[in-house]
Amino acid sequence: MSNLDKIKAVYDAFAKGDIPSVLEIMSPDIDWTEAEGFPYAGTYHGPRAVLEGVFMRLGTEWKGFAAVPHEFVDGGDTIVALGKYSGTYKATNKSFQADFAHVWKLRDGKAVRFVQYVDTLLVQRALDAALPNP
């Protein structure tokens, strides 16, 4: 299976709620970086940190959170996914949609680095009851 096929499979698994399959692509030493301004901003080291710091929170704090890619750029060991986030933040009951870019770096068929790019203001509007949605 190519690196591109592996990353496509990650998004398919995430959409189905199959988090163990998402974690399986990760190297034990993965660096996973969430964008500054995103609710879970920072760099997480290792699959367990990603599970606890990102995925478990997405599952408990959001209704219908989705990350749907619409385009991939295949650079061999570097795969870029372009897509759209959507979801409703439970605490405010506010929804959002925002375009994302995810940059994946793979080594020996495992993801060693993930970097998220997103317009975090669109996300913050869902988190903050006082901020208007566009």
Task: Label each residue range with its predicted role.
Residues 1-28, 128-134:
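Short, low-complexity N-terminal intrinsically disordered segments enriched in polar/charged residues
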Residues 7-10, 22-26, 30, 46, ...:
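Hydrophobic pocket/interface hotspot
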